[in-house]
Amino acid sequence: MVKEGVYMDRISYNDIDFNKLMKLDYDSLESNIYVDKEKQRIYKIFKTEDLCELSYKLVKLDLLQRKNKKGKMIVPDTTIFDRHFCGTIEKYVPGVNLDDIFIKYRDINHVMKVFLDASKSLQDIHEEKVVVADLNSANIRIDENDKSHYIDTLSYRVENLDNNTVSYLLKEYLNSKNIQPKKIIKEMDKITFLLMYFNLLFNKSVNEISYSEYEKKEDEIKCLKNLYDSFKLIKSRRKNIDVPYLHEIIDPLNYKKY
């Protein structure tokens, strides 16, 4: 966990031996991403050369370091400079992204345990006045002990800093209701988390899930009955809604009963 007063390391871009790194086959608009061959560290080299944008990232990074007291976010601990700030280094988390959770686990009880841990971690992040904003299953890393870690943290909104990043799940949802938010707030994060949950469970967007299909799935996964009211609320035409965290709807202590 990061404490107040902890300073980030800093290295020169020219000191990085890229022959010892492997470039990840990951389509990112923001960065070229590498991992060392021992899979200990993630290197991100920003694609932008806009000095104002880079300066903004550096301010946000400093705030994230100070905020991450509960350790639920993977915040870079080293900055890379090449005359100016141009990248970061952070620890690599062995495991899988949440979008691969059904490949790793077939047992719905195990899957639900992971989802509930991720939901509780999201609440912890919100309590530190951070909004994930680009919340999606590729940005939640599940380690080998089934604990969740929120990654790609420079896309988050910290306190009152402006942030233009919006999750594709939330963007689709807001567009369907003709909503143009001024900023992404934690209540939207909670909606996005449930959108993500239903998306992974049904392998389609919420807008494509029919009520009859949902009710049929309830026979297979019992906890969906508890989520039916939230599902209806999300699918409703109401613009301003507030949904609970997943772990507030489903008792984490009863994860063997899903």
Regions found by a protein language model. Give the residues of each.
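Helical subdomain adjoining the active site within ATP-dependent kinase catalytic cores
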Residues: 4, 19-25, 29, 33, ...
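Conserved alphaE helix
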Residues: 110-124
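Conserved structural core of kinase catalytic domains
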Residues: 71-114
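Conserved end of the kinase activation segment
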Residues: 176-187
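Activation segment/activation loop of eukaryotic-type protein kinase catalytic domains
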Residues: 138-173
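ATP-binding glycine-rich loop module of kinase domains
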Residues: 19-79, 101-102
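Catalytic-loop of the protein kinase fold
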Residues: 122-143
